[in-house]
Swiss-Prot record:
Keywords: Acetylation, Cell projection, Cytoplasm, Cytoskeleton. GO terms for cellular component: cytoplasm; cytoskeleton; pseudopodium. The gene is MSP-1. It is found in: Cell projection, Pseudopodium; Cytoplasm, Cytoskeleton. This is Major sperm protein 1.
Length: 126
């Protein structure tokens, strides 16, 4: 049987993550992930700057019509001495093989199953 692709997710905000100056303290921005679909999904966050950007929770499972708030934190840094072009967070998601799965498993993303991605660029307002 062919595997069905994961349905769309929604994020709020939908387009980007914004951090405002000053950058001398840790700042946190919240992103809501919504699974409007009919299947349980596993999700995982990645970033281009893992030493500066952290996500909590970094992964999880969402049932149909469920949502979760994810805290995206930016550690203190000097924007004049660091390249911030291309900074982004990416949320990846896939259908869970077991419709009753409650715990995230990294192996869902490592096989030949279908994984979808949504990039959220990071904007730094100096």
């Amino acid at each position: 049987m062919a595997q069905l692709p994961p349905e769309d997710i929604a994020t709020m905000p939908a387009q980007k993550v914004v951090f405002n100056a000053p950058f001398d303290n840790k700042a946190t921005y919240y992103v809501r992930i919504i699974n409007p679909g009919t299947k349980r999904i596993g999700f995982a966050f990645k970033t281009t700057k893992p030493k500066r950007i952290n996500m909590n929770p970094p992964n999880g499972v969402l049932g149909p019509k469920e949502s979760v708030n994810v805290a995206i934190s930016c550690d203190a840094f000097d924007p004049s001495s660091e390249d911030t072009k291309g900074d982004r967070v990416t949320v990846e998601w896939c259908n869970t093989p077991d419709p009753a799965a409650a715990a995230f498993k990294l192996e869902w993303f490592q096989g030949d199953g279908m994984v979808r991605r949504k990039n959220l660029p990071i904007e730094y307002n100096v």
